[in-house]
Regions:
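A charged, well-structured terminal subsegment
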Residues: 109, 116-117, 170-194
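A short, well-structured juxtamembrane/interface segment
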Residues: 24-44
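Generic N-terminal amphipathic, Lys/Arg-enriched alpha-helix
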Residues: 1-26
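Short, well-ordered beta-strand core segments
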Residues: 117, 143, 160-163
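Short beta->alpha connector loops at strand-helix junctions that form conserved
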Residues: 84, 121, 147, 162-170
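Short, glycine/polar-rich helix-capping loops at beta-to-alpha or helix-loop-helix junctions
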Residues: 146-158
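Short glycine/serine/threonine-rich phosphate/pyrophosphate-binding segments
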Residues: 56-61, 125-132, 154
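Glycine-rich, small/polar surface segments that engage phosphate groups of diverse ligands
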Residues: 37-111
């Protein structure tokens, strides 16, 4: 039994490393473009609006915390808001309109031209993330999608698409976290160097 569990640990780590390696070998331009769009938006007084479901909601909150607080360097606070945290808004919009509108409605209320919307979806199929990216684009926000699998409708809804090509939700989430840390690092460096 212990050997089976040890094998599981080793196999899981090997899968995670293999996917990180695959993404490392891919084109870095979408990640660089995402960071540049965020730097440009924040540099012009805009804000970053982040959203996703489940683990992706947690990632949205994590990035907002890193930018409002600090990632690795002391610098001025950066305007980042996770649209996943206000349970009263989420439940009222979900109940009165539809769950597919919980993020789009907040984009309509909070988003302004020059802001940046970052939608996260491991499946690439989340209707509420697609709806929010559509609302953001209509309002003149830059749009970024961070997806898994083939990117799906979420990837197609965004101007900038960062994809982690895997069917494993857990492995996609792990690489998403790494890529989001890279984006935080790039954004933070841009503001520290100013």
């Amino acid at each position: 039994m212990n050997n089976d569990r040890a094998d599981l640990v080793i196999a899981t780590l090997a899968d995670a490393i293999a996917l990180h390696e695959r993404v490392k070998q891919s084109d870095p331009q979408p990640v660089l473009a995402a960071a540049a769009a965020i730097v440009e938006g924040l540099g012009r007084g805009g804000k970053l609006l982040l959203f996703g479901n489940g683990g992706s909601a947690a990632d949205a909150q994590h990035v907002a915390a890193e930018l409002v607080g600090r990632f690795q360097a002391t610098r001025a606070a950066l305007s980042a808001i996770a649209l996943t945290t206000d349970t009263s808004v989420l439940t009222s919009v979900g109940n009165d309109e539809a769950f597919a509108r919980v993020f789009a409605r907040q984009i309509e209320a909070l988003g302004r031209e020059g802001d940046v919307a970052l939608g996260i979806s491991t499946s690439g199929r989340s209707p509420n993330v697609v709806s929010a990216l559509d609302a953001a684009r209509t309002r003149g926000l830059r749009t970024i999608a961070l997806t898994g699998r083939d990117g799906g409708a979420v990837g197609r809804a965004a101007e900038i698409h960062v994809n982690v090509p895997s069917e494993s939700t857990a492995r996609v989430q792990e690489v998403h976290r790494t890529l989001l840390h890279v984006i935080c690092d790039l954004v933070e460096r841009a503001f520290v160097e100013r």
